[in-house]
Amino acid sequence: MTSERKMLVTSALPYANGHLHLGHLVEHIQTDIWVRTHKMLGIQCISVCGDDAHGTPIMLKAEQLGITPEALTAEIKLSHEKDFKAFAIDYDYYHTTHSPENQVLATTIFERLQAGGDIVKKTIRQFYDPVKQMFLPDRYVKGTCPKCAAVDQYGDNCEVCGATYSPTDLINPVSVISGASPVEKESEHYFFDLPLYEELLKDWTRKGHLQAEVTNKLSEWFEAGLKQWDISRDAPYFGFPIPGVPDKYFYVWLDAPIGYMASFKKYCDERGVSFDEFWDKASKTELYHFVGKDIVYFHALFWPAMLAASGFRTPTAVYTHGFLTVEGQKMSKSRGTFIEARAYLAHLHPEYLRYYFAAKLNGRVDDLDLNFDDFVNRVNADLVGKVVNIASRCAGFINKRFDNRLSSELNDPKLHNDLLSARESVIDAFVSRDYARAIRQIMDCADKVNQYIDANKPWVLAKDESKLNEVHAICTMGINLFRILITYLKPVLPMMAKASEEFLNSEPLHWGSIDKPLLNHRINTFKPLMVRVEKEKIEAMLVQSKESLMTTPVKENTPVEDANLISIEDFAKVDLRIAKIVNAEPVEGADKLMRLILDLGDAQKQVFAGIKKAYDAEELIGRLTVMVANLEPRTMRFGVSEGMVLAAGDGQGIYLLQPDAGALPGMKVK
């Protein structure tokens, strides 16, 4: 089975300042299943990835560890590659953005943008650390909250009261890096003039390159108006210097997606493949990116505009997935559910997770929840109980009674053909990234096979020597049906498929190799392909995750002494009201702000809340929350905020307060 199609597939590049966790693996497993599906179809499908190895966090972490950024990123890259290999995630090339290939391509693209008039210079003001002599991102400034007087709060929001503000609003601000008091300073930055490409992007986003949910989201951003994109950072910075501009570097988000091209360029140089065939503006090949919903803006707006403006092809499609939650909540270090890949591997088989994620991924942008009771049930009941059990039950008789040789004919060709008839539908489900549908169809087939074996009862027939031929035929049938099932599951379970090929004594299985059954064929002695999940191992994994990630005590957020106690009269001054969120939209140009319109029954108020990273706008609309209704309005650069919504936080997540059923907009909270 061969095809003339040529495809290049990428996953988002993991950041090179920490180890992989299960949230990363959702995307990389999703990508790997899709690539394996196409390779089994005989399509030239090349997958590349690499580490995102630039930026301030990497520079500072390396300094903290007393090593160079190059040494840090090299070490993390090895860790990432080791984890990917353990989970059978098999990229054709895995590179790094800190590479000669990426520097050449980033410089080329920038110079083409500059020559085309797409780069503009603007002066901006931000906090500057006079000791470290560097500009400070918001998260590298801390001080006392201007709202509640809680100390040691970040420069963009307070984790005690939930207020959002600018770093310059902090009381007694200090640099997280040096402890010095920062000063405001101007700097000239380089911007990509994204609004010039608004019509091109509108056209591109409406031609089926994105999921419908993403296209709808982009429509909101178009309505709000596109902004020029800051693509430069000031020294000191770990990244590529902008040619001819002293002390200026490309922002990490400029060269990170170019890293896809750089990884492929390295692959081409080593394999003799044409880079231009895949990246030329007139390319007939296909280009696919798998990304999380948090980086859609970069991949569906900046990236295609930058490619088109610099003379390269644009993506065939950008496929977006949701976030991973654990037991219905965001991953949490304190609960032990922030699980690193290495902690999982210390206790559980990697293909349990591949199977579970496949059973939940549906091609939409929905979040995926890892529920451990469901995890145990799906693996034990479906994968082990239904699929592996078929081979186990039938192979025992073939191994012991028939010298490992299958019979010379099938006793139920119709059932064999019934399972084969599901092939196109299973392939279609995998290709459309609806892996959950594929798994359901495969398990339906497995049910039919188990019903066949249960109805024929070879273990009963085997007690009668005169019926051994029937036992032989039934078990031969079972082995051939298992062969079909494991072929269907091969993109999801490549390790188990390989072990099955060895057991079946067959060539590598692919979509077109299973039409002809194995008859009068010698198989090998069966060895267990997969064992059941033990709940104790899950508990041990959670304990390890909690212990390993909580070695540093969490600093308690406490307000200043005089603010510890208030009188009931003081509390009574705060007018807390039930509010209904009638509209929500992310604030363009602000990392964390969401603009909320709140209905108080007899009036509506606008509030800016720092919950953008915790919630999508769509999930907020219509829900009830609690707001401070008599807070003095505050003018921000995005508009006037007329109150504050209440949320809880542990430093790892933000959780909006929501009243019980029966509460109505405008009710006082007492």
From Swiss-Prot:
Cofactor binding: number and manner: Binds 1 zinc ion per subunit.
Q: Which InterPro entries match?
A: aa-tRNA-synth_I_CS (IPR001412), Anticodon_Met (IPR041872), Met-tRNA-synth_bsu_C (IPR004495), Met-tRNA_ligase_1 (IPR023458), Met-tRNA_synth (IPR014758), Methionyl/Leucyl_tRNA_Synth (IPR015413), MetRS_core (IPR033911), MetRS_Zn (IPR029038)
Compartments, as annotated in UniProt: Cytoplasm
Q: Which GO terms describe its molecular function?
A: ATP binding; metal ion binding; methionine-tRNA ligase activity; tRNA binding
Task: Give a Gene Ontology cellular component term annotated to this protein.
Answer: cytosol
EC number from the UniProt entry: 6.1.1.10
Matching PROSITE patterns: AA_TRNA_LIGASE_I, TRBD
Give residue ranges for domain tRNA-binding. 570-670
Sorted keywords for this record are: Aminoacyl-tRNA synthetase, ATP-binding, Cytoplasm, Ligase, Metal-binding, Nucleotide-binding, Protein biosynthesis, RNA-binding, tRNA-binding, Zinc
Pfam families with a match to the protein in the record: Anticodon_3, tRNA-synt_1g, tRNA_bind
Placement of sequence motif 'KMSKS' region: 330-334
Q: Name one GO biological process term.
A: methionyl-tRNA aminoacylation
Residues the entry annotates as binding ATP = K333
What domain of life does the native source organism fall in? Answer: Bacteria
Quaternary structure, from the entry: Homodimer.
> What is the designated name of this protein?
Methionine--tRNA ligase
